[in-house]
């Protein structure tokens, strides 16, 4: 995909060591626009309303939004955006309390999940298009 990148939260804590994996992980979300929503409304709800909610309710140390300009192959799925979320600790992959920035605080975790899901429902139709999520190793290479 050809994308326009917006780095909403740049990592200040992850080590920049070429060829070395960080102690964290990346989660990639591949987004489709709900058919009932026009593009400008979708983009506004994702980039203007949701961004800070995502940063505030998850333990991310890096958050990048990529709006897809066009697919580079005919076979590419019809995604409209790719989100990159960087987590400093790989345990966030398996522990929702860490993922939702609520280590040891169940009430905070539940509140953060609720805020996140309410925000996501403004630009994701989970019944029409389930969001594809991919967890992967994280390597930070200095730009």
Where are these regions (language model features)?
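Macromolecular interaction modules
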Residues: 1-143
């Amino acid at each position: 995909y050809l994308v326009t990148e917006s780095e909403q939260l740049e990592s200040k804590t992850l080590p920049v060591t070429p060829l070395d994996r960080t102690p964290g992980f990346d989660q990639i979300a591949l987004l489709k626009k709900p058919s009932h929503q026009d593009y400008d409304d979708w983009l506004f709800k994702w980039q203007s309303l949701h961004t800070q909610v995502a940063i505030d309710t998850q333990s991310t140390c890096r958050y990048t939004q990529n709006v897809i300009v066009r697919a580079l192959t005919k076979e590419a799925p019809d995604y409209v955006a790719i989100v990159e979320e960087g987590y400093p600790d790989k345990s966030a992959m398996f522990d929702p309390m860490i993922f939702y920035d609520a280590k040891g605080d169940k009430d905070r975790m539940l509140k953060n999940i609720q805020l996140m899901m309410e925000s996501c429902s403004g630009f994701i139709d989970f019944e029409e298009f389930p969001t594809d999520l991919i967890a992967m190793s994280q390597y930070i290479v200095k730009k």
